[in-house]
């Protein structure tokens, strides 16, 4: 665990921790077998899922996104009592809301719901984990943008709900309407709605439907979504600023549009990832591509480009934050992100940021199963199966609240 403590103004009556500039063992979870760690590029809260399906949350809770029945921040992972009879297998975090996925393919949600992003059929706050109003095939993946949600079922069908701004729900509309001559409103989706149309566009901007799309992975940035199907075709939709959609322009896309760059490549994409203003893809042969804005200033990548510094690495997991990136590869962790950073790169207090991929030296020799990034922090799940694994982990300092 590395990164920034909470904002001083969030809950003044509660003491805050310190900024962690290098990786630490998270004391409250020491000895706990963790299956999933979830956060998000817009999120200041986290979800921990254990191997036996228990679900714990901690971090900011200003809208009840921890699902604990109140709006008090938690510094220590706290059991979500409303899910104690469920076996949780996955989770995703938006700005102020959370989705929880169970082994039965059901989805629960909690937190801010003013845009319907909790998917419970209304826009009332959701303080305890409540079942999303979805009927159909079991859900296998959940993802969250800032104020919208995406769920993927076992047939490869995508459903979205929440704020439709920029076309980020993929329903061929941005949902805008005028409440008065000077006040704008949105027709929010309060229940999951199927994404029906996937398209590709030619140079004349003419749209042609793409058939037989079975989505296998999906990821969300602040206001955009990227997905890959069973044939390795990559689609993106929503806000197009800084080229984060990968279509060589900055136009918003109201429905999923196929990224043409990958059509001419013999690189089957298997996973996609998204930060606030950028997207990434991992291919079957281990190559990593990035597009959009991964730094505070300067030029953006308007279409996918290979991350050359990662060539030759066996990449397993990628975590995306606001502009920072962390990668688990081989027996190392690699990170980069331009200043200002807040410790999420784990490079130490003397080298707090890096414009280029840099190995986190204190993680050398550690096998990281998964890396997840929040708004200004990083969570890593490390292997501890062997005596050597345990010895390597013992060299890390421990952080306790």
Which residue stretches match the model-derived regions?
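Eukaryote-biased RCC1-like beta-propeller repeat architecture
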Residues: 1-401
């Amino acid at each position: 665990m590395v990164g920034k403590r909470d904002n001083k103004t969030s809950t003044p009556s509660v003491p805050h921790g310190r900024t962690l500039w290098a990786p630490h063992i998270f004391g409250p979870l020491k000895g706990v077998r963790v299956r999933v760690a979830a956060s998000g590029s817009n999120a200041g809260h986290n979800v921990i899922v254990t191997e036996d399906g228990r679900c714990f949350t901690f971090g900011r809770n200003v809208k009840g996104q921890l699902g604990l029945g109140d709006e008090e921040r938690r510094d220590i992972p706290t059991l979500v009592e409303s899910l104690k009879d469920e076996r949780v297998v996955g989770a995703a975090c938006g700005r102020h809301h959370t989705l929880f996925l169970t082994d039965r393919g059901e989805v629960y949600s909690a937190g801010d719901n003013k845009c319907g992003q909790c998917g419970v059929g209304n826009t009332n706050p959701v303080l305890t984990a409540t079942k999303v109003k979805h009927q159909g095939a079991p859900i296998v993946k959940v993802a969250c943008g800032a104020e919208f949600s995406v769920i993927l079922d076992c047939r490869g069908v995508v459903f979205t709900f929440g704020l439709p701004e920029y076309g980020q729900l993929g329903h061929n509309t941005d949902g805008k309407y005028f409440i008065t001559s000077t006040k704008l409103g949105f027709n929010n989706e309060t229940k999951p709605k199927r994404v029906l149309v996937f398209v590709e566009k030619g140079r004349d901007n003419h749209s042609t439907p793409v058939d037989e799309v079975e989505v296998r992975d999906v990821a969300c940035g602040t206001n955009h979504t990227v997905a890959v199907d069973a044939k390795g075709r990559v689609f993106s939709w929503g806000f197009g600023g800084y080229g984060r959609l990968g279509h060589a322009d900055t136009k918003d896309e109201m429905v999923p549009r196929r990224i043409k760059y990958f059509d001419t490549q013999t690189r089957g994409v298997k996973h996609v990832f998204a930060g606030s203003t950028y997207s990434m893809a991992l291919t079957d042969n281990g190559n990593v591509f990035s597009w959009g804005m991964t730094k505070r200033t300067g030029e953006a990548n308007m279409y996918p480009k290979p991350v050359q510094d990662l060539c030759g690495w066996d990449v397993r997991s990628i975590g995306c934050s606001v502009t920072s990136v962390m990668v688990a590869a081989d027996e190392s962790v690699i990170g980069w992100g331009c200043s200002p950073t807040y410790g999420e790169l784990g490079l130490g207090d003397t080298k707090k940021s890096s414009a280029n991929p840099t190995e986190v030296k204190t993680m050398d020799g550690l096998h990281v199963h998964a890396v997840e990034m929040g708004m200004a922090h990083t969570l890593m799940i490390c292997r501890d199966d062997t005596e050597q694994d345990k010895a390597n982990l013992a060299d890390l300092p421990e952080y306790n609240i």
